[in-house]
Amino acid sequence: MRLFHEAKNKIRRRGVSTQQVVESLHTNASAALELPILHVETVALCVVKYTTPPAAALELKDLISTAASELWKPSSVFKSGSSVVTLDTEDRQCSEYNLSKDYLTCHPEDPLRRAGSAIDNVMRSVMNDYRAKYVMHAIESSYTVLLKYDVGGHFVSHYDAARSAPRAVSVTCFLNDDYVGGELYFEHLNITVKPSPGLIIVFPSDYPYRHLVTPIEQGTRYSIVKWYSYV
């Protein structure tokens, strides 16, 4: 009972009702959320798409959008090649939640705990495959960031590596597609990736792989991003 009340209080602070907490604890207690890799496609040098079940991705989106409803904050960004973190909405306009910081301390049936575990599992499989193809050295990631782009949300052309963030590999997982806009465009490769639930794209973090997110015209775009650095 004590664990139930701890979970209830923690999740209610996120704007989730007691009924939703009860449903989470009883309905989802033994339900592991899995995103197995169904298909792998190389679309350009070192740019690889991984397809996972759309239904599982949509369930993950529902977990995140509910459980993190009170936790979103304006997204910050490193200026490319610098050590400066900025909240400049002219460059990037979206909300984020760093799931890595606390989901492992959540109650086992907390929706964010389930989401974090599912993300870790699929990313481990994806990166094992990608590293076998392209990366010689060991890599690791300590960040799992949830992103929410509302109408008008965007991210100008950029690359992910910076002096104080020496990233080697970038990963984006799309959770839904019921919105207009929000495409991922690689400027130098002239490749547009149209989001679909469960699609994961992996690519190097440096300059040749500059990319942008086109403005959201309608709806809300949910995604997960991770960055990996050499150990």
Model-derived features with residue positions:
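Conserved, well-structured core segments
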Residues: K49, V145, V169, C173
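A short coil-to-beta-strand element that immediately follows conserved catalytic motifs
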Residues: K133-T144
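Non-heme Fe(II)/2-oxoglutarate
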Residues: V16-Y134
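Membrane-proximal basic amphipathic "stem/tether" segments
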Residues: M1-E23
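Charged, surface-exposed interaction regions in soluble eukaryotic proteins
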Residues: K133-Y134, V156-Y159
